[in-house]
Amino acid sequence: MLNLLILILFIVFSSPIVAAEIFVSNTEKNCPEWSQDKLQRETNSLMQQMAHWDQLYRQKGISEIDDEVYDQLMSELTHWQFCLKQAPHSDFPVEVFPDNKLVHPVAHTGLSKLKDKQEINRWLHGRLPVWLQPKIDGVAVTLVYQNGKLVSLISRGNGAEGVNWTAKSRYIPDIPQNIENAPPDLVLQGELFLHKEEHRQQLLGSDGARNRVAGLMMRKDHSSELKQIGLFIWSWPDGPAEMESKLRKLADMGFPLALRYSHKIEEPEQVQKLRMHYFEQPMLFATDGIVLKQEIEPKGNQWRSGSNSWAVAWKHPLRHQVTQVREVNFTIGRTGKISVVLGLDKVKLDDRQISRVNIGSVRRWRQLDVLPGDRVTLTLAGHGIPKLAQVVWRIKERQDIQPPDKQHYHALSCLTLTVGCEQQFNARLKWLGENLQMTGVSSGSWAMLTERKLVTDLTGWLALSAQQIAALPGIGDKRAQAIYSQFSKAKNQPFSYWMKGIGVPYMDKLSDNVYHWQQLEQKLAAAQLKQQLTVGQLKKLSDFVSDAQIKAIAEKLSVAGITGFDRENGVVVNPADMAQ
């Protein structure tokens, strides 16, 4: 299986961009803060996982992981090997398959990857006009023709030599075996890709296309599925100097796609427009970006692997971004619900910097089995909210992390500030402030008040003075006065706002019928809310209202003179009113 992984490393990473990417990523990234022994164990574990995926691709054509995710994990693996000072993987295939390799007549150079529009514009400066082509997501190859006859089909490999795939070429209709009007010695470089119908990269990603091609080409048998493979020629070393002439000649020789999908760029604005075109519109192949190239290229004998100044790539926005889980945090909401939030290595997704993601309940966290050190993929859900898509690799050495005891947190817990109640109590204050329509009183404001023990129950803020608030670190007189003003205004808010704010259930259904605390108690005692609430809802409401802590809150609000809680002006409810 390890040998299979080595071969896949050799072939699947035949994309011309990879060599440059690996060098840059390894020199820019920091090595993991692990011991060498642990780093070696985790590296071996990741290699085994990659080998498993490759085995499925080769033997069954099953894609368990998207190509762009595979690439990111392979980059991580290569980086760890770099940290371990291990030999580059590109040397391995020659040792493993010495009898099945061929030297490229012209080296595959690879491409530098530019990150954004600003870098693209800098590269374009002084070079326009240039040409743009889609960066086909497939397997790079060299085709060698002598006197019009195909004599070699070679995988990119390490750029200097690759695997001999000539025998497979006869089963791929898009590869001409003979060309009548070819020059005596013809060397072409291009991409084997999987034919698609109406493929939208933005929606579907690469859909395992590249690995599917690699799997078909590596099989010992000649599968009928080889006819699904297409060929896009993206380079003709030592061909016609003018691109338009080169493209027409390629089409005449049986390679029409380059002519159809090449665009002359005279203004920088065209680049972004075409990049999004290939990302969003239906195509007959998967793409992972666009390639820009100058019209004038060096002679083929000057091409070197990892060295290319006349062409660059700009990849598509990632649909799935791989990142490392740094920590697992448990948040407790005002009702006692425990949620799990993962702290992440910061990543950029659709121009957003993401460093945390909410994955929901403790139960789902256990199902996902995600811990610090694991690699996860992120996507953006509706309204740009980050979403965990998948745990793609789990670290071998697992931490033992225990969530808070759910028995301690519920609808009536943490109504006062006690040890272990900080999160839920602050969430209750935030909810109360929002329902009382306080502006400028943030979660941070409440946290400062509770940290200094100025507020230890849901009504404690009613008695605060502006001077007490101003004494908090970093508040200042102006902000303290603004907060105090909001507290003062809140005292005059309607009864229904207060009821919802302190957490009384189902107030949306009762606000038209209940306008005083004593009235609610009396209606519950007389079972006069059956028309508005179900049996279960009535029990939940009754349990809440009859709780000693809630009664204490109502009493404090009464003392503070809050409308609807004041007992001096309490109402006497007659039977007719109770029946409403």
Curated annotation (Swiss-Prot):
Q: Which Pfam families match?
A: DNA_ligase_aden (PF01653), DNA_ligase_OB (PF03120)
Q: Does the keyword Manganese apply?
A: no
**What does this gene product do?**
Catalyzes the formation of phosphodiester linkages between 5'-phosphoryl and 3'-hydroxyl groups in double-stranded DNA using NAD as a coenzyme and as the energy source for the reaction.
> What's the top EC group for this one?
ligase
Q: Which reaction does it catalyse?
A: NAD(+) + (deoxyribonucleotide)n-3'-hydroxyl + 5'-phospho-(deoxyribonucleotide)m = (deoxyribonucleotide)n+m + AMP + beta-nicotinamide D-nucleotide
Q: Which HAMAP family match?
A: DNA_ligase_B
Q: Which domain of life is it from?
A: Bacteria
Q: What Gene3D superfamilies does the record tag this protein with?
A: DNA ligase/mRNA capping enzyme, Helix hairpin bin, Nucleic acid-binding proteins
GO MF terms, alphabetically ordered: DNA ligase (NAD+) activity
UniProt keyword DNA repair, yes or no: yes
Specify the protein name. Answer: DNA ligase B
Gene Ontology BP terms: DNA repair; DNA replication
Residue pairs linked by disulfide bridges in the UniProt entry? none
- Assigned EC number: 6.5.1.2
Catalytic site positions: 135
Q: Which gene encodes it?
A: ligB
* UniProt xrefs under InterPro entries: DNA_ligase_B, DNAligase_adenylation, DNAligase_N, NA-bd_OB-fold, NAD_dep_DNA_ligaseB, NAD_DNA_ligase_OB, RuvA_2-like
Q: Which UniProt keywords apply?
A: DNA damage, DNA repair, DNA replication, Ligase, NAD
Spell out the family assignment given in the record's similarity comment: Belongs to the NAD-dependent DNA ligase family. LigB subfamily.
